[in-house]
Regions:
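Conserved, well-structured core domains of diverse proteins
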Residues: 1-93, 97, 102-116, 120-121, ...
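Alpha/beta enzyme core
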Residues: 113, 128-129, 134-136, 148-234
């Protein structure tokens, strides 16, 4: 006689912590498309959030701070090794590069204002500089991307730091993809591309293929900016 208390196979599969209905649906979609899925907004998988950010104490490398009577400073200085004008942040967090197009003009301006209020920096992201964002940013990174969309040496000279885009967590190993619905006339003009169609960026930079080439490219930007600003990698 069958044990009526034993879970059925359907129940066991339904409780799988790995192959959830969402994961199975994603597999089916990829099988039908024959490639990875592309959409705007964010990743499908859960990612770390602010509540999971933790700083490890350096109790052996320096004296600890008595929190109830001493002030803890979070000031961070970047680029002091090579740059004549290192960038100073009040907190060790900055607004990473998100392009105009992926974000609206209002969103870019709001992030710039918020970063300035917090004493930190924001980044141009892909597609070049938009003047309102730069105007509201007290500290601003100019991003050099694989496609060179919107790249302007004159805008680079207005930056407090330069950032080479190599990869990002949302699309590891893949290039950029801006959906056609977001490619307005203004976005298209900045990138010198047609409006209303998807815009793709290559997965790697066209003028360097390894560490030696990257070193030369960094040196090129240092000389172009007269060693004034820091250079970092994303």
């Amino acid at each position: 006689m069958a044990d009526e208390t034993a879970p059925s196979s359907k129940t066991v599969l339904g409780r799988s912590p790995i192959f959830t209905p969402e994961v199975i649906n994603d597999i089916h979609m990829k099988a039908e498309l024959g490639r990875y899925r592309m959409r705007g907004f964010s990743m499908f998988k859960p990612i770390p959030h602010w509540d999971q950010l933790m700083f490890m104490p350096g109790t052996l490398t320096r004296f600890v701070i008595e929190g109830y009577r001493e002030k803890c400073l979070t000031k961070t200085v970047l680029g002091a090794r090579f740059a004549k004008k290192p960038i100073e942040l009040d907190i060790p967090v900055y607004i990473t590069g998100m392009s105009f197009g992926a974000l609206s003009l209002e969103a870019k301006m709001a992030l710039a204002k918020g970063a300035s209020m917090a004493g930190t920096a924001t980044c141009s992201g892909e597609g070049g500089m938009i003047p309102p964002e730069r105007d509201h940013s007290t500290k601003w990174y100019y991003q050099c991307i694989q496609s060179r969309y919107g790249f302007n040496p004159h805008h680079l000279m207005l930056a407090d730091a330069c950032e080479f885009f190599i990869g990002q967590g949302a699309k590891v190993g893949l290039g950029g993809h801006l959906m056609g619905q977001k490619v307005t006339e203004q976005v298209a003009e900045m990138r010198s591309l047609p409006a209303g169609i998807d815009q793709r960026s290559p997965a790697r930079h066209p003028d360097w293929l390894g560490p030696d080439d990257l070193s030369l490219k960094i040196q090129e930007i240092r000389e172009a900016t007269d060693y004034q600003i820091p250079i970092q990698l994303k």
